[in-house]
């Protein structure tokens, strides 16, 4: 197949083959996390979006969503000269509550601040001249992260509210934030939440290498329809090119972040050789986090082991369990 693709690169004749015949031979489904597919799946299917929101947001039985209306995804500032922002999916329900959904491939502190900014803007936008503050409705921000940012806990769902610092039962209602670290998701950890498990499996198990879909995903009406919308045959050549371009940009971004992170690690290691390995590791980690991905991962641990550090030092520096580090050192 690679030869077949390469043979058609001359005279700019690759497009039809690569994104038509060749693509369909290789792939059956697209990854739902890509910008194109995520918006196609959830941006124009109310019942499907309602199912996702009810499954993933911390809503009580009385707070469940029953009907929504889509809103423009561009958030225009209230004041002249303010900052315009765009979200992936935005809707409101019959109560007037706002629901903002974002699919993010890479974690950064800047993204967290953007989430706060967007939710605050949605909350403030409800205020009308002469209106009552008591009429303002809550804003829910659901953020699906294809990355790990909380290394100090196995929890992958993080819900935030404005609470009293000494009594969490005292809450200022209005802003609700949910962050889900998709790479941490394991179905058995939330087996009692069936729809949450199914939607997270849909987001994490289906990709360009998928050939067969598990029956329990297909048996759910909304998820089954979403799977159909991921079939390669339903996309145009232009859409497939946009899909490829998206993943290319993600790959470039990750490479740049990893390079910055590794550079910080190496600079810290050099200083550490002079002032003590422990202190140097700490500086390297701090600089690496400031310039790059802000986390220690398995690849970094392997590099440190190759440099001759002990399993205990690598475990301390990367925050990975000692058992995992020892397993890496034996491979």
Language model region names:
Residues 20, 24-26, 99-104, 201-331:
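Short, charged alpha-helical interaction segments and adjacent helix-coil junctions
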Residues 3-9, 14-238:
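Conserved single-residue anchors adjacent to enzymatic active/cofactor-binding motifs
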């Amino acid at each position: 197949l690679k030869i077949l693709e390469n043979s058609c690169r001359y005279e700019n004749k690759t497009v039809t083959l690569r994104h038509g015949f060749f693509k369909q031979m290789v792939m059956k489904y697209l990854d739902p996390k890509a910008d194109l597919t995520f918006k196609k799946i959830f941006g124009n299917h109310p019942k499907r979006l309602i199912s996702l929101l009810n499954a993933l947001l911390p809503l009580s039985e009385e707070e469940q969503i029953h009907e929504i209306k889509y809103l423009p995804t561009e958030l225009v500032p209230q004041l002249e000269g303010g900052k315009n922002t765009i979200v992936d999916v935005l809707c409101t329900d019959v109560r007037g509550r706002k629901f903002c959904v974002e699919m993010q491939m890479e974690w950064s502190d800047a993204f967290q601040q953007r989430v706060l900014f967007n939710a605050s803007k949605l909350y403030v936008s409800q205020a009308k001249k002469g209106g009552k503050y008591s009429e303002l409705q809550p804003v829910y921000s659901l953020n699906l992260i294809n990355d790990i940012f909380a290394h100090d806990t196995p929890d992958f769902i993080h819900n935030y509210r404005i609470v009293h610092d000494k009594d969490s039962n005292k809450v200022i209602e209005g802003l609700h934030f949910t962050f889900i670290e998709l790479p941490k998701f394991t179905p058995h950890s939330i087996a009692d939440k069936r729809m949450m498990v199914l939607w997270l499996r849909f987001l994490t198990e289906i990709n360009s290498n998928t050939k067969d879909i598990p029956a329990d995903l297909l048996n759910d009406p909304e998820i089954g329809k979403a799977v159909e919308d991921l079939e390669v045959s339903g996309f145009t050549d232009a859409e497939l090119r946009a899909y490829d371009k998206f993943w290319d940009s993600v790959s470039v971004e990750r490479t740049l972040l990893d390079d910055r992170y590794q550079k910080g690690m190496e600079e810290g290691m050099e200083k550490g050789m002079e002032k003590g390995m422990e202190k140097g590791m700490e500086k390297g980690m701090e600089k690496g986090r400031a310039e790059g991905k802000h986390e220690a991962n398995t690849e970094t641990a392997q590099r440190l082991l190759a440099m001759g550090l002990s399993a205990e030092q690598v475990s301390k520096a990367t925050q990975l369990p000692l058992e995992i580090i020892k397993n890496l050192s034996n491979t």
